């Protein structure tokens, strides 16, 4: 999920990590085992004078499967379920409105959760910008998981940003 946001003007930083669980400073091994209550997530720092939260939400929706309650693509389990973690009432409102708009557009129930942000724990360094550090491996993973094919099936010709 870092790549689509990294390239956007106004995005200051994108950090892979874990949100929503009860274990302090969890490791990838703990989170991927599914017992911490965390979800794999990205933290996006942005300049609101250069990019809107609504634009970030649009990019988010076009890069996930909002219909899959079991995870994302070939990553299954509650730790891979999609969510938007909000930090204030305005962002909650915008996230819920965007979710409703996506549901209307797709004519389906959207299973992505909109949740209050809890402490964000950065993932280990080898996870940061994995797609840049390991481009061949990332491309292989993305292709074999059917990510691009599934996004095209959901969104049609709309760009995945």
Across the structure, where does each feature detected by a protein language model lie?
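Flexible coil/turn and secondary-structure edge motifs
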Residues: 1-161
